[in-house]
Amino acid sequence: MKKGFFITIEGPDGAGKTSLLDNLMPALRDIFGDNLIETREPGGVRISEAIRKIVLGLKYPEMNRRTEALLFAAARAQHMVEKIEPALADGKIVLSDRFVDSSIAYQGGGRELGIEAVGEINNFATNGLQPNLTLLLDLPSEVGIARIMKHRSDEVNRLDKDRLVFHKKVRQTYLQLAKDQPNRIKVLDATQSPEKIAINALQLIQESLKGWI
């Protein structure tokens, strides 16, 4: 049986991941049909969705940064065994809204826990699984925060409320990851129109899948 293909969408808050997925999924479904599995993090399965409510909700402002990192990793571990690993083993294309790179950028960089420390936690949680392709939406932190406050006033989560300096560290860490892993992580200019971003993303996905299909 053909081995599955794992794609992740990453980016700082306000970069437009939701818009990209809304524009991208219809085209991908037309191409791949039932072979495409869409999911998200934290979440994707029941236990992980429950953790999502705790770690992203506004109910626990006292949450320690290490607690935060471990909760994200715990949600990811359950997501892996219940959804991602079985789908990949079945030869599916898995498209996830966020994965390990988010933890490295947000907790490793933004929370200053360190890239190596957060990487080790998540290596244990995922048994070392890495995506085949990661699309990183990038834009200035000031622009991203402005978008959040303008368009997502009813859905702002705990991480959205962090200071600008936090979000700048997140972006810097993402860009460092892309610099270190250029074959896997492809950077998309998130200041472009949603339609243009979706076209570029679809092209990158199709190019990456040429040897797989």
From Swiss-Prot:
The keyword Transferase applies. Its EC number is 2.7.4.9. SUPFAM superfamilies: P-loop containing nucleoside triphosphate hydrolases. InterPro entries: P-loop_NTPase (IPR027417), Thymidylate_kin-like_dom (IPR039430), Thymidylate_kin_CS (IPR018095), Thymidylate_kinase (IPR018094). Pfam families: Thymidylate_kin. CDD domains: TMPK. It catalyses: dTMP + ATP = dTDP + ADP. Keywords: ATP-binding, Kinase, Nucleotide biosynthesis, Nucleotide-binding, Transferase. GO terms for biological process: dTDP biosynthetic process; dTTP biosynthetic process; dUDP biosynthetic process. ATP binds at residues 11-18. It is an enzyme of class 2 (transferase). The keyword Cytoplasm does not apply. GO terms for molecular function: ATP binding; dTMP kinase activity. One of its GO terms (cellular component) is cytosol. Belongs to the thymidylate kinase family. Phosphorylation of dTMP to form dTDP in both de novo and salvage pathways of dTTP synthesis. This is Thymidylate kinase. It comes from Oenococcus oeni (strain ATCC BAA-331 / PSU-1). The lineage of its organism: Bacteria, Bacillati, Bacillota, Bacilli, Lactobacillales. The gene is tmk.
